[in-house]
Amino acid sequence: MKASQHIQNILTRLPHQPGVYKHFNEAGVVIYVGKAKDLKKRVSSYFNRKTYENNKTKLLVRKIRDIEWIVAPTEQDALLLENNLIKEYRPVYNILLKDDKTFPFIVLKN
């Protein structure tokens, strides 16, 4: 799906770092929150596809009008931040982690 010039400009500025991204609709409402090991690769992947796994993703991409991101020190930090932002914004396109009864966890191994 072809991205608007505004979105293309955002994609060029995304870093190759872990973090969280927020997709906004034309009303400025957060419609999706996601995490990435590599923000540039992950966010760009939404706009470089010819086909999508499901209609939900296709509809989401059509509604994206702006993108913000937050760089995280690690992928684990991004996961925790993603969970908090999903609970804060309750984006319509996020299904997992949406209810307050789910808890992300990290296993520490030696």
Located regions from the model:
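Acidic, glycine-enriched active-site microenvironments
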Residues: M1-N110
